[in-house]
Amino acid sequence: MNQTGDLANLDGLGEEEANRLKSLMKLRNAMYSDEFRGWLRRVTGCGPLSAKKKDMSINDYRHGCHLLNHDDVISTRRISFILYLPDPAEPWQPEWGGSFEMYPVKEKHVPDDLPSNIVPIKWNQFNFFVVQPGHSFHSVEEVVHPTQSRLSISGWFHRLQPDEPGFSQEEEDRELQAEKEFSSVGSLISKKFMDAFVEYDEATYGGPSLPGSRMSTEHLKFLA
Protein backbone atom coordinates (compact mmCIF):
# COMPACT_ATOMS: atom_id res chain seq x y z
CA MET A 1 0.00 0.00 0.00
CA ASN A 2 1.22 3.49 -0.87
CA GLN A 3 0.29 6.12 1.71
CA THR A 4 0.76 9.86 2.14
CA GLY A 5 1.56 11.56 5.42
CA ASP A 6 -1.20 12.88 7.67
CA LEU A 7 -3.29 15.47 5.80
CA ALA A 8 -3.20 17.65 8.91
CA ASN A 9 0.25 18.61 7.66
CA LEU A 10 -1.33 20.49 4.74
CA ASP A 11 -1.66 23.45 7.09
CA GLY A 12 2.10 23.91 6.85
CA LEU A 13 2.14 24.37 3.07
CA GLY A 14 3.03 27.65 1.45
CA GLU A 15 0.38 29.65 -0.39
CA GLU A 16 1.35 28.41 -3.86
CA GLU A 17 1.34 24.74 -2.83
CA ALA A 18 -1.88 25.13 -0.86
CA ASN A 19 -3.63 26.62 -3.90
CA ARG A 20 -2.78 23.49 -5.88
CA LEU A 21 -4.57 21.37 -3.28
CA LYS A 22 -7.59 23.58 -2.58
CA SER A 23 -10.13 20.84 -3.29
CA LEU A 24 -8.33 18.36 -1.04
CA MET A 25 -8.09 20.90 1.79
CA LYS A 26 -11.78 21.76 1.40
CA LEU A 27 -12.70 18.08 1.71
CA ARG A 28 -10.41 17.57 4.70
CA ASN A 29 -11.81 20.61 6.51
CA ALA A 30 -15.39 19.48 5.86
CA MET A 31 -14.66 16.04 7.33
CA TYR A 32 -12.87 17.58 10.31
CA SER A 33 -15.75 19.99 11.01
CA ASP A 34 -17.93 19.99 14.13
CA GLU A 35 -20.97 19.36 11.92
CA PHE A 36 -19.53 16.20 10.39
CA ARG A 37 -18.35 14.83 13.73
CA GLY A 38 -21.78 15.52 15.15
CA TRP A 39 -23.40 13.60 12.30
CA LEU A 40 -21.12 10.61 12.90
CA ARG A 41 -22.00 10.65 16.60
CA ARG A 42 -25.73 10.67 15.87
CA VAL A 43 -25.52 7.85 13.33
CA THR A 44 -23.23 5.56 15.32
CA GLY A 45 -24.03 6.46 18.93
CA CYS A 46 -20.28 6.28 19.56
CA GLY A 47 -20.10 9.06 22.15
CA PRO A 48 -17.96 12.22 22.11
CA LEU A 49 -15.27 12.60 19.44
CA SER A 50 -12.12 14.63 19.84
CA ALA A 51 -11.92 17.97 18.05
CA LYS A 52 -8.13 17.91 18.42
CA LYS A 53 -6.95 14.44 17.48
CA LYS A 54 -7.83 13.14 14.00
CA ASP A 55 -5.92 11.10 11.41
CA MET A 56 -6.39 11.19 7.65
CA SER A 57 -4.24 10.12 4.71
CA ILE A 58 -4.48 9.18 1.04
CA ASN A 59 -4.01 5.48 0.29
CA ASP A 60 -3.24 3.91 -3.06
CA TYR A 61 -3.65 0.14 -3.35
CA ARG A 62 -2.05 -1.28 -6.50
CA HIS A 63 -1.53 -4.81 -7.81
CA GLY A 64 -0.77 -7.16 -4.91
CA CYS A 65 -1.69 -4.68 -2.16
CA HIS A 66 -3.94 -5.97 0.63
CA LEU A 67 -4.60 -5.63 4.35
CA LEU A 68 -4.84 -8.58 6.73
CA ASN A 69 -7.62 -9.11 9.27
CA HIS A 70 -7.43 -6.78 12.29
CA ASP A 71 -9.74 -4.68 14.50
CA ASP A 72 -8.11 -1.20 14.14
CA VAL A 73 -7.68 -0.82 17.91
CA ILE A 74 -4.64 1.45 18.28
CA SER A 75 -4.25 4.52 20.48
CA THR A 76 -7.59 6.28 21.10
CA ARG A 77 -9.33 5.46 17.83
CA ARG A 78 -13.13 5.62 17.99
CA ILE A 79 -14.35 5.64 14.36
CA SER A 80 -12.61 4.31 11.25
CA PHE A 81 -13.57 5.69 7.84
CA ILE A 82 -12.76 5.20 4.16
CA LEU A 83 -13.78 7.47 1.27
CA TYR A 84 -13.27 5.62 -2.03
CA LEU A 85 -11.95 7.64 -4.98
CA PRO A 86 -11.14 5.25 -7.84
CA ASP A 87 -11.29 6.63 -11.38
CA PRO A 88 -15.01 7.49 -11.91
CA ALA A 89 -14.55 7.22 -15.68
CA GLU A 90 -13.78 3.51 -15.31
CA PRO A 91 -15.94 2.03 -12.52
CA TRP A 92 -14.13 -0.37 -10.23
CA GLN A 93 -15.06 -4.00 -10.88
CA PRO A 94 -15.41 -6.55 -8.02
CA GLU A 95 -13.18 -9.03 -9.86
CA TRP A 96 -10.31 -6.53 -9.58
CA GLY A 97 -10.15 -7.22 -5.84
CA GLY A 98 -9.69 -4.57 -3.16
CA SER A 99 -13.11 -5.08 -1.54
CA PHE A 100 -13.64 -4.22 2.12
CA GLU A 101 -14.27 -7.43 4.09
CA MET A 102 -15.99 -7.61 7.49
CA TYR A 103 -15.73 -10.59 9.85
CA PRO A 104 -18.02 -11.96 12.56
CA VAL A 105 -16.63 -13.18 15.88
CA LYS A 106 -16.69 -16.99 16.02
CA GLU A 107 -15.75 -17.11 19.69
CA LYS A 108 -14.89 -14.52 22.30
CA HIS A 109 -12.76 -11.88 20.56
CA VAL A 110 -11.63 -14.27 17.82
CA PRO A 111 -12.67 -13.46 14.22
CA ASP A 112 -14.09 -16.07 11.88
CA ASP A 113 -11.91 -17.31 9.02
CA LEU A 114 -14.33 -16.08 6.35
CA PRO A 115 -15.93 -12.62 6.00
CA SER A 116 -19.66 -12.27 6.58
CA ASN A 117 -19.94 -9.11 4.49
CA ILE A 118 -17.97 -7.94 1.45
CA VAL A 119 -18.31 -4.30 0.35
CA PRO A 120 -17.29 -3.63 -3.28
CA ILE A 121 -15.55 -0.38 -4.23
CA LYS A 122 -17.57 2.53 -5.65
CA TRP A 123 -16.62 6.11 -6.46
CA ASN A 124 -17.48 8.56 -3.66
CA GLN A 125 -18.63 5.76 -1.34
CA PHE A 126 -18.05 6.49 2.35
CA ASN A 127 -17.61 3.52 4.71
CA PHE A 128 -17.27 3.95 8.47
CA PHE A 129 -17.60 1.90 11.65
CA VAL A 130 -17.04 2.16 15.39
CA VAL A 131 -13.71 0.71 16.52
CA GLN A 132 -14.41 -2.03 19.10
CA PRO A 133 -11.70 -4.15 20.74
CA GLY A 134 -12.06 -7.76 19.67
CA HIS A 135 -15.10 -7.06 17.46
CA SER A 136 -14.47 -4.63 14.58
CA PHE A 137 -12.52 -7.14 12.50
CA HIS A 138 -11.98 -6.32 8.84
CA SER A 139 -9.52 -6.70 5.98
CA VAL A 140 -8.88 -5.43 2.45
CA GLU A 141 -8.98 -8.03 -0.31
CA GLU A 142 -5.86 -8.21 -2.46
CA VAL A 143 -5.93 -6.02 -5.57
CA VAL A 144 -5.36 -8.28 -8.57
CA HIS A 145 -5.77 -5.87 -11.49
CA PRO A 146 -2.32 -5.21 -12.98
CA THR A 147 -2.73 -1.44 -13.53
CA GLN A 148 -5.79 -0.01 -11.75
CA SER A 149 -5.43 2.16 -8.64
CA ARG A 150 -7.72 1.65 -5.64
CA LEU A 151 -7.47 5.22 -4.39
CA SER A 152 -9.05 6.31 -1.12
CA ILE A 153 -8.87 8.75 1.76
CA SER A 154 -9.03 6.99 5.11
CA GLY A 155 -8.39 7.66 8.75
CA TRP A 156 -9.79 7.77 12.25
CA PHE A 157 -11.69 9.98 14.63
CA HIS A 158 -10.56 9.62 18.24
CA ARG A 159 -11.95 9.64 21.75
CA LEU A 160 -11.78 12.81 23.81
CA GLN A 161 -8.25 13.75 24.87
CA PRO A 162 -7.26 14.61 28.48
CA ASP A 163 -7.31 18.39 27.96
CA GLU A 164 -10.72 18.48 26.22
CA PRO A 165 -14.02 19.34 27.96
CA GLY A 166 -15.97 16.24 28.97
CA PHE A 167 -12.93 13.97 29.22
CA SER A 168 -13.30 11.27 31.90
CA GLN A 169 -10.22 9.47 33.18
CA GLU A 170 -12.42 6.71 34.58
CA GLU A 171 -13.96 6.11 31.15
CA GLU A 172 -10.54 6.24 29.51
CA ASP A 173 -9.20 3.64 31.95
CA ARG A 174 -12.06 1.30 31.02
CA GLU A 175 -11.27 1.78 27.33
CA LEU A 176 -7.59 1.04 27.87
CA GLN A 177 -8.35 -2.10 29.87
CA ALA A 178 -10.66 -3.38 27.11
CA GLU A 179 -7.97 -2.71 24.51
CA LYS A 180 -5.39 -4.54 26.58
CA GLU A 181 -7.59 -7.60 27.02
CA PHE A 182 -9.49 -7.91 23.78
CA SER A 183 -7.87 -6.06 20.85
CA SER A 184 -6.10 -7.96 18.08
CA VAL A 185 -2.83 -6.25 19.01
CA GLY A 186 -3.34 -6.96 22.70
CA SER A 187 -4.07 -10.62 21.97
CA LEU A 188 -0.69 -10.97 20.27
CA ILE A 189 1.19 -9.93 23.40
CA SER A 190 -1.14 -11.28 26.08
CA LYS A 191 -0.12 -14.51 27.81
CA LYS A 192 -3.82 -15.18 28.31
CA PHE A 193 -4.18 -16.11 24.62
CA MET A 194 -0.81 -17.82 24.18
CA ASP A 195 -0.31 -21.57 24.03
CA ALA A 196 2.37 -22.82 26.37
CA PHE A 197 5.70 -23.39 24.63
CA VAL A 198 6.74 -27.02 24.74
CA GLU A 199 10.26 -27.90 23.67
CA TYR A 200 10.89 -30.96 21.56
CA ASP A 201 12.32 -33.91 23.41
CA GLU A 202 15.43 -34.52 21.35
CA ALA A 203 15.83 -37.97 22.84
CA THR A 204 12.59 -39.14 21.20
CA TYR A 205 12.46 -36.74 18.23
CA GLY A 206 12.99 -38.79 15.06
CA GLY A 207 13.20 -36.01 12.46
CA PRO A 208 16.12 -33.92 11.18
CA SER A 209 18.38 -32.24 13.71
CA LEU A 210 16.83 -29.15 15.26
CA PRO A 211 18.62 -25.78 15.13
CA GLY A 212 21.00 -25.56 18.09
CA SER A 213 21.11 -29.32 18.61
CA ARG A 214 24.41 -30.95 19.51
CA MET A 215 25.98 -32.92 16.67
CA SER A 216 25.86 -36.66 17.01
CA THR A 217 29.02 -38.71 17.48
CA GLU A 218 28.44 -40.18 14.03
CA HIS A 219 28.37 -36.74 12.41
CA LEU A 220 31.47 -35.60 14.31
CA LYS A 221 33.38 -38.66 13.13
CA PHE A 222 32.31 -37.98 9.53
CA LEU A 223 33.53 -34.37 9.68
CA ALA A 224 36.83 -35.43 11.26
List where the protein language model places each region.
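Active-site-proximal binding-pocket segments
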Residues: 27, 31, 36-42, 46-53, ...
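Sparse, context-dependent recognition of short Cys/His-centered cofactor- or disulfide-binding micro-motifs
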Residues: 12-16, 21, 25, 41-46, ...
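Residue-level signal for well-ordered alpha-helical segments
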Residues: 13, 17, 35, 46, ...
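Non-heme Fe(II)/2-oxoglutarate
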Residues: 1-43, 206-224
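Catalytic core of Fe(II)/2-oxoglutarate
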Residues: 54-77, 84-223
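Proline-centered turn/helix-capping motifs that create local helix->coil transitions or kinks
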Residues: 1, 47-49, 89-94
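Short, functional N-terminal and low-complexity linear motifs
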Residues: 2-9, 48-49, 106, 120-122
